[in-house]
Structures are given as C-alpha cells and as structure tokens.
Design a protein with these regions (language model features):
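Intrinsically disordered, metal-sensing/regulatory segments
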Residues: 1-247
Length: 247
C-alpha cells in the first residue's frame, strides 16, 4: 500500500524530481530501515535468545551476517541498476535501463517483506517475545517507509520520458515482492519458530545491507547537502517512537 501511494505521486508530477527531494526521501527510508532493523528485529532476536537459554548475541550475530551475505549474493547474480548510476551491476543481461532500475528496488524490498513476515509468524505462533502491537509497529513503519520508495522509483522514470501510467505501474510492481514474501514467511510459521532469533537478525542484516550499499550513497552524492542526513534522523526517530509506543 505504501509503495503504491508513493508511486501515485508520479500522476501529479509536472516536472523532474528535484535532487534534494530525492535525497530527503532516500534519507527518510534509510532512517526507518535502520531503526526497524535495530528496535524491531535485532533487539527482539537477542531477547528471545536469552529466554531460550542461549548466548543472546550468537543468533543475532550469525543471522545478521547471513542476511548481509544473502543480499550480497543477490546483488551479484541479479542484473540491476541503481538510481543515478550509469553502469549496471550483477550478471550481464540485455535488460533495458528501466527494467534494471525496477529490479534494483524490487531486490532490496525482499528483506522488508521478510521482516514483516517473520514478526507476524512469531506473533501468530503465540511466541512470548512478540506482541501484536510490536508486529503492527513494524508493519506501519515499513508501510511509511515504502511511500518514499514508491516515489523514488516512479518519479525518476517519469523524468526519463516514461508515461505517467507506466511509471506508476513500475513503481507498484517494485513493491509486490514485499507482501508475497511476508505471506510465504507466515505460512511457514511452524518451521520458523525454532530458528526465529536467527531469522529476525537475518532480516535485520539484509535491511542494513540495503541502507549501506544503496541508500546512504544515494543520499550523499555531490553536490553535498545535509538534507539526507537530517531526514534520516527523523525517519529513525519516527520508527523508534512507533516501536516503543506500540511494542
């Protein structure tokens, strides 16, 4: 829903997306993702590990690194193109520039769907460390963060000459992987619970990878402005408040 609403901004767009607006949107998305990774995923992972009688840092550390390497692997094998970049990444292909731009966003939406699915799977299984309010906080935060993501993909496509309707559809499609990933994760809840601490930190590692590998470089491009950093902090604080207030 958040991605679709953000993508809908292109329908009212009359000119190119200003680079400061793009940096602000990117910074906000990055801030929400970092806060969600810490407050909604890593900390619950360590809390559950302690209640299971394990060293609380082991599942968090192992799962986090596995999440990072998983996204690194996908980055290497899936052809994609980051915003404002000229050279594509991943395996060589004959894909068009617009297709690879959408693939980049779709690829990096995978951990967000996983995060929501893992948390709801834990709640659905009546896991003691995950409340309905906590799962709602993460879902709401991801939905808010998806709004700028939808705008970030659809509006630049429009700036490159794509029709408004087509740019909107591409923006919506980039977020389809999230609900699909979340539903699949929930359906596998009975298999997930025994390794829930690892999966929570896995999703956190994948999300932090996206922030460091894609979002921070995009919000820090020349010419230098601090707008991305400031809005990053606002996004982080908003997600932190949501998690603490609802969780």
């Amino acid at each position: 829903m958040g991605t679709s609403l953000g993508a809908a901004c292109v329908l009212f767009m009359k000119k190119n997306l200003h680079y400061l607006v793009q940096r602000a949107l990117t910074g906000f998305a990055a801030g929400v993702m970092v806060a969600a990774g810490v407050w909604s995923l890593l900390i619950p992972s360590m809390e559950q590990s302690a209640k299971m009688g394990r060293l609380r840092f082991v599942p968090a550390a192992v799962g986090f690194m596995l999440g990072v390497f998983f996204l690194l692997f996908l980055d290497r094998v899936i052809p994609h193109l980051h915003m404002n970049a000229t050279e594509p990444e991943g395996a060589k292909s004959g894909f068009k520039r617009t297709t690879m731009l959408v693939l980049a966003v779709t690829l990096h939406n995978i951990p967000e769907g996983m995060a929501v699915g893992v948390v709801y799977a834990g709640w659905a299984a009546d896991h003691h460390a995950i409340s309905a309010a906590g799962a709602l906080a993460l879902s709401l935060g991801i939905a808010i963060q998806n709004f700028p993501e939808g705008a970030i993909i659809s509006m630049p496509l429009r700036s490159e000459g794509m029709g408004k309707g087509k740019a909107f559809v591409y923006g919506v499609l980039s977020g389809v992987v999230e609900p699909v990933g979340a539903v699949l994760t929930i359906l596998l809840a009975q298999f997930i619970i025994p390794v829930l601490p690892y999966l929570l930190s896995f999703a956190a590692g994948a999300m932090i990878y996206v922030v460091v590998e894609e979002l921070i470089p995009e919000m820090s491009e020349k010419p230098h402005f601090n707008i991305g950093t400031i809005v990053f902090a606002l996004g982080f604080v908003l997600m932190m408040i949501l998690d603490v207030a609802l969780g």
